[in-house]
Every structure is written in C-alpha cells, then in structure tokens.
C-alpha cells in the first residue's frame, strides 16, 4: 500500500525543510534498501534502474545532485530487526537536534523482557505501544510508528481501513494522538479510474480535524505528492 514509502517521504521533508535529525528504525527493510528508495525519491530516477544498474548519463547526473542534497541532511537509519523500545530510547537520547522518530513497523518489535507478557501478542503490542507513548513524551519529539492492519477490510464492500482494523491493536488506538491510513483503490480494483491516486485517511486526530486527503502516488519513485504537483527536471 505504501506505508514505508510515505514514512520515507515524511522523513525527507523533516530532514530537509526543518533541518532536524531524523531517526528511522527499520525492522523490516535493510539500510541499503532504504537508501536506494531515498535516492530514487530524491533524484526521480526509477528504483528499478537503481536496482538493475541500467543508468544513463542523465540518471547519473540526477543521482549526483540527489546524493549531494541527501548528504546535507541528518537521517540516521538503524536496521536492527530485534530492537526494543528501551534500545530505541537510548539511541535517540544520544542524538542532537532530534526532530522525528520513525519506526517500521510496530508488530515486528519485541518486548524488552521476552515472556513477560506470555504469548499474547495483543498484550505485547499494547505494552510496546504504551512504552512508545511514554518515550515520545520524555523525548518531546513526535514518534511515527507504522502498523499492520488485519484483513477484516477485505470482507467489506468498502475496503477503506478503519480504526478497528489495526492489527493486534490493544492500546494503539488509545495511545496514538493521530492515526492515519493509506488507501489506494487500484490495489483492490485494477480497473479503477483512480490510477496512482492514494487517500490519506486521518481517522483520529486528538488536536485537530479528521478527514481524507488525496495524494498522487508515483510507485516508480516511491513518492507521494499533492495532486497538482509536477516534477520539473
């Protein structure tokens, strides 16, 4: 659906626009895979070209400019697949000018003390969710945590996700200040007229309004943008 892609888009925006340090903890993808995606997003060179190495002179020029721009940002990527909240907290406390923490994704995280909550994943995920909430308050920075959904929406006519679809949700809905879902109609309906259109559904917003924003999705660059936005170059 594009949850890692939109997380990287947010990561880039915070690092470039606000010149803040961003900590990205990836439990699913490797550092190398994420860097390739960042390069594709920043350079507008198709990711397939990067992975196959089939690059022309124009591509190399774009990559050079993108690499220079990325080198001016402070994006820290940690791809430890077994990291705990306590370890994330400790790493973040050592970072200066921290502006955002991103975690991809919640259900892959392990409890600090394995076996403490038994084999009940709902309880484990709820404990992790609560610990992340406390960490965000202590660090005084926003923490964006990606999450899997259950497959309950697949049995509905309208497959747009709802809060009740949060997998192993427990306290996720309660702890989060904001909950946003991504929905792309073509994922379920290949013949839809909304090709490469994504809906960002703000299902919960403790400090503002809820609603839906439509975005343009460019899968070849792993990029989301405003519908009216056009890349020059």
Q: Residue spans of the language-model regions?
A:
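C-terminal regions of RecA-like/P-loop NTPase motor modules
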Residues: 85-101, 110, 115-117, 130-140, ...
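Flexible beta-alpha connector loops of hexameric P-loop NTPases
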Residues: 47-57, 75-81, 110-126, 153-164
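Conserved lysine of the Walker
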Residues: 3-4
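Cytosolic-facing regulatory segments adjacent to core modules
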Residues: 7-9, 13-97, 111, 212-216
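Hydrophobic alpha-helical membrane-association signature
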Residues: 7, 124-131
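Walker B catalytic acidic pair
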Residues: 105
